[in-house]
Amino acid sequence: MTEVYLGIDTSCYTTSLFFMDRQGEKVAEARRILKVKPGGCGLQQSEMLYQHIRNLPELMEEAAQGHEFSLLGIGVSAKPRPREDSYMPAFLAGQGFARSLAALYHIPLWQISHQENHLEAAMWSAKGPEADRFLFLHASGGTTDLLLAEKMAGVAAEKNVNEAATTEKKSGEVAAATKNKKVAGNYTLKEIGCSLDLHAGQFVDRVGVALGLGFPAGPALEQLAAQHTEILEIPVSVHKTEVSFSGPCTKVLRMIEQGNFAGEEKDSDITQVIATTEQAAATVQTATVTQQHYSAANIAAGVQWGLAETFVRMIRNAAKEYNCNDVLLAGGVASNQWIRNLIIEKLAKRQIRVWLPENRYSGDNAAGCAAYARRQSENQGII
């Protein structure tokens, strides 16, 4: 019989389970993307909750097949972000499932936020950063946050763990968090940057659906962009560590609505910035174009370029202001390989080290919940 910690995450579009052993290695996992009708742009919370409730027992059967588990503890995402005012019904499915198992087997239950789950999963997979202080970029459909993570030392870290355990034993909640600074495991997280309007994933999904792709559109957009012949540079809006995707998204959607893509014959007299793949990583040339037709692939590549350039400027500004040379990336948008490569290339010129989890642990998963439960339980000597 294998002793394991169970991680559970029921986000907006994925149901996830993860089993981790005492050595911190994966034993089994199962996840399922929620179904969205073709042409749809999302799900209502009631539909998310319904699908999660149906998925959880089926995924448990799938993950447990061929194994005999002895549960030591459970970690679950209970809300979107580590804030007192953070709430989303979708997480009630996983939270209720976790509480029932914990009560039945009399084992510790650790409740964290979906964002903390991303942090924990990314650190577990990337095996770092090792620095006591680093930047954390969480870019997904529901979040575009840049945070400063600082390791708590000695007595402060021990006090935090004990307080969290006491709080959870009494009320099943994570340690209290303020608006801009919160506790994640043995780290404090300070919000230092964000999107002022659309999140990165919303930008991707809106353009993807307009191009006829399914929802969520991230993986399909990346595949489409791989067919590009040139990269359309879209506007980038960054002020220090605050960014905006609303303007760039509107511009791209207008181009699609006007039909200036996919080989359609339509004259236009507009000025655009165009770059080849190599130029996108270095110098971009400006050209006035007549009779310009943008393929869907070139538009998709332009969206990727705009996201990567936005993240690079955001991280670069924060690294300078907070004197940090390490950044950890997580979130569905951050799993895009082309975006990753461009970020690494550009930040390397500034001696900023980029830490990347495996793609499957950048998007929604439950590995972080399991890793958190394992560390907290064993640090306290509960098991």
Can you annotate each of these PLM segments?
Residues 59-72, 314-324:
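Phosphate/pyrophosphate-binding loops at sites that engage ATP/ADP/AMP, CoA/4′-phosphopantetheine
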Residues 326-327, 343-369:
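Conserved phosphate-binding/catalytic loops in two-lobed NTP-binding clefts
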